[in-house]
UniProtKB/Swiss-Prot annotation:
Co-factor: note: Binds 1 zinc ion per subunit.
Protein localization: Secreted
Coiled-coil annotated residue ranges, if any: none
Main location: secreted
Identification of the protein by name: Probable carboxypeptidase X1
Main function: May be involved in cell-cell interactions. No carboxypeptidase activity was found yet.
Binding residue positions for Zn(2+): 360, 363, 498
CDD domains, per database record: FA58C, M14_CPX_like, Peptidase_M14NE-CP-C_like
Signal sequence range: 1-20
Species of the source: Homo sapiens (Human)
Region described as Disordered: spans on this chain: 30-62
Length: 734
């Protein structure tokens, strides 16, 4: 859907010739006058934003670039140049405040900006605490004025991408109630997220109040005049303005002064604020809940991540192993933490499970959750936690916290609130890794339409297309590394951790109807995938909060916070679909939070939201049947034997030791084990709600032809009884 949305942006209405239009959006600035705010103190002077640097003809040009995604190729196109016309010079009420654009602060400097976000983006601030002077519609109300909120495909519905004041509103304002006295230190703004329109504020003032009736403004140190803060020059880039002096108040207002000509005063915002102690405040909210686990709750760049993983390995050397599956385009290693009672060894009958995070580098919560999970498992194992001990003794857990470390480093440098919605999403080749796996859906569906599945074309372990294996194929090194990893280890269960929504999506991710934007496209194992998705969603505290509002433009709670991926938006080349069709592994996508890159003060609560879900999901690998397929004569396991379940058109295969795991929901199943050179065997296997997979072992007997091949290959003579049997089978007499 993102590709469709971005492509449609090319057909958006042309932007007017001038930026920075004030108040009623008429070219030039109105004379300074009185700002009448209901219940406010009198007379605040308007101040125009400082005009941009002039070119030779008296105008300033800004090049806006948008990303157009066509199929799998990422193409960068230049939009039409936008001309900034210098407004008529007027005496301002005070000097313009210098903005702090995204990306200008190093991580260490970011800590000095003072306060963390109040919680507009993370939804910690409820809709009832957001107000405005006016709104164009309900879908453009103040509850939509949250940093990084995304609109739906259509404007004018209930889910538009900003707060927008009415055109007739002469003195627009957007107000946030912190709930109690708070130290405000800064403001971050964006324009309107829309496929069809360009709207953003170019300058604004800030006011404060303790009772929402008496207001005072933020002032410059040098002049003592009201400060005018320069805002945005495009819809998406977050712009941070630190206040000249932090202010303690309960309410904060943003008053747009100028905005894009031809547009409307529209903005999305986040407020930087610190709580303050006030013994007279009788309505103090309960402190934000966190976690009592002794874990490292902060964001980790590549160097810090390596250091943390090494510390965990040194603390728990008997249950951990760190290994690399390859390198990113920039040469950063893709590190995996393996956790098991026998790390580095595949034990017969012990399933392999994995979590993958950071496929999109700017979706940072999954990365931190996996780093927290490995710390937690180590800590609890040392404490003798029986649940953790059982997990580590019954399965091998593989944690890949950063599949796209290059993208993450870009996002980390920008900072959690300034990275925006998409920067750092792609790898350094501008490849979206979740569209980069081989499309195996199309050849499977074409073969099904021709009646070739499963007799001619298998319904599992589909081979890579020839084009995908060519040296010049557009396949990211990160993708190649993960595919090799999938082939090397017999994974059974996986989850791909993303961010930006609160929902669990399951395969298929790609619609069966070509070019359909969305369409319900279930797999043959739809019941299993729905179960897995429901287990995670039902164990996630945030997803189960019935009082929470939707993140952006869809309310997934009406479906239990799960959805078929293709019925949400089509994703050709997804890792989920590839994992299901190329390996034995069942994988879902978990969208962990409305905020892709939450501030680190949100991490303790996000850990509590997901801790039980992460553990419970891993335990689902016990659901279904498991066993070993052995050779009757040698009693050795048979590798690559096929396990077929009657009524489910998708098979799995045995690992190199002959062991297998087949995820199934409770019920009775007729299961067939077959292997080349062996007679097939079918038996009934019952799956119940009891813990642990139902043991369903098979012993296969070689066919006479296979026995003959093996004898001849060994140079032995064919026994008379076998020779006579073969001749009888051929219809010949001795």
């Amino acid at each position: 859907m993102w590709g469709l949305l971005l492509a449609l942006a090319a057909f958006a209405p042309a932007v007017g010739p001038a930026l920075g239009a004030p108040r009623n959006s008429v070219l030039g600035l109105a004379q300074p006058g009185t700002t009448k705010v209901p219940g406010s103190t009198p007379a605040l002077h308007s101040s125009p934003a400082q005009p941009p640097a002039e070119t030779a003809n008296g105008t300033s040009e800004q090049h806006v670039r948008i990303r157009v995604i066509k199929k799998k190729k990422v193409i960068m196109k230049k939009r039409k140049k936008l001309t900034l016309t210098r407004p008529t010079p007027l005496v301002t009420a005070g000097p313009l405040v210098t903005p702090t654009p995204a990306g200008t602060l190093d991580p260490a400097e970011k800590q000095e900006t003072g306060c963390p976000p109040l919680g507009l983006e993370s939804l910690r601030v409820s809709d009832s605490r957001l107000e405005a002077s006016s709104s164009q519609s309900f879908g453009l109300g103040p509850h939509r004025g949250r940093l990084n909120i995304q609109s739906g495909l259509e404007d004018g519905d209930l889910y538009d991408g900003a707060w927008c004041a009415e055109e007739q509103d002469a003195d627009p304002w957007f107000q946030v109630d912190a709930g109690h006295p708070t130290r405000f230190s800064g403001v971050i703004t964006q324009g309107r997220n829309s496929v069809w329109r360009y709207d953003w504020v170019t300058s604004y003032k800030v006011q404060f109040s303790n009772d929402s009736r008496t207001w005072w403004g933020s002032r410059n140190h040098s002049s003592g005049m009201d400060a005018v803060f320069p805002a945005n020059s495009d819809p998406e880039t977050p712009v941070l303005n630190l206040l000249p002096e932090p202010q303690v108040a309960r309410f904060i207002r943003l008053l747009p002064q100028t905005w894009l000509q031809g547009g409307a005063p529209c903005l999305r915002a986040e407020i930087l604020a610190c709580p303050v102690s006030d013994p007279n405040d009788l309505f103090l909210e309960a402190p934000a809940s966190g976690s009592s686990d002794p874990l490292d709750f902060q964001h980790h760049n590549y160097k810090a991540m390596r250091k943390l993983m090494k510390q965990v390995q040194e603390q728990c050397p008997n249950i951990t192993r760190i290994y690399s599956i390859g390198k990113s385009y920039q040469g950063l290693k893709l590190y995996v933490m393996e956790m098991s009672d026998k790390p580095g060894e595949h034990e017969l009958g012990e399933p392999e499970v994995r979590y993958v995070a950071g496929m999109h580098g700017n979706e940072a919560l999954g990365r931190e959750l996996l780093l927290l999970l490995m710390q937690f498992l180590c800590h609890e194992f040392l404490r003798g936690n029986p649940r953790v001990t059982r997990l580590l003794s019954e399965m091998r857990i593989h944690l890949l916290p950063s599949m796209n470390p290059d993208g993450y480093e870009i996002a980390y440098h920008r900072g959690s609130e300034l990275v925006g919605w998409a920067e750092g999403r792609w790898n350094n080749q501008s490849i979206d890794l979740n569209h980069n796996f081989a499309d195996l859906n199309t050849p499977l569906w074409e073969a099904q339409d021709d009646g070739k599945v499963p007799h001619i074309v298998p319904n599992h372990h589909l081979p890579l297309p020839t084009y995908y294996t060519l040296p010049n194929a557009t396949v990211a090194p990160e993708t190649r590394a993960v595919i090799k990893w999938m082939k090397r280890i017999p994974f059974v269960l996986s989850a791909n951790l993303h961010g930006g929504e609160l929902v669990v999506s399951y395969p298929f991710d790609m619609t069966r109807t070509p070019w359909a934007a969305r369409e319900l496209t279930p797999t043959p194992d739809d019941a299993v995938f729905r179960w897995l998705s429901t287990v995670y969603a039902g164990s996630n505290l945030a997803m189960q909060d019935t009082s929470r509002r939707p993140c952006h433009s869809q309310d997934f709670s009406v479906h239990g916070n799960i959805i078929n991926g293709a019925d949400w938006h089509t994703v050709p080349g997804s890792m989920n679909d590839f994992s299901y069709l190329h390996t034995n592994c069942f994988e879902v996508t978990v969208e962990l939070s409305c905020d892709k890159f939450p501030h680190e003060n949100e991490l303790p609560q996000e850990w509590e939201n997901n801790k039980d879900a992460l553990l419970t999901y891993l335990e689902q690998v016990r659901m279904g049947i498991a066993g070993v397929v052995r050779d009757k004569d040698t009693e050795l396991g048979i590798a690559d034997a096929v396990i077929a379940v009657d009524g489910i058109n998708h098979d799995v295969t045995t690992a190199w030791g002959g062991d297998y795991w087949r995820l199934l929901t409770p019920g009775d199943y007729m299961v067939t084990a077959s292997a080349e050179g062996y007679h097939s065997v079918t038996r009934n296997c019952r799956v119940t709600f009891e813990e642990g997979p139902f043991p369903c072992n098979f012993v296969l007997t070689k066919t006479p032809k296979q026995r003959l091949r093996e004898l001849l290959a060994a140079g032995a003579k064919v026994p008379p009884d076998l020779r006579r049997r073969l001749e009888r089978l051929r219809g010949q007499k001795d």
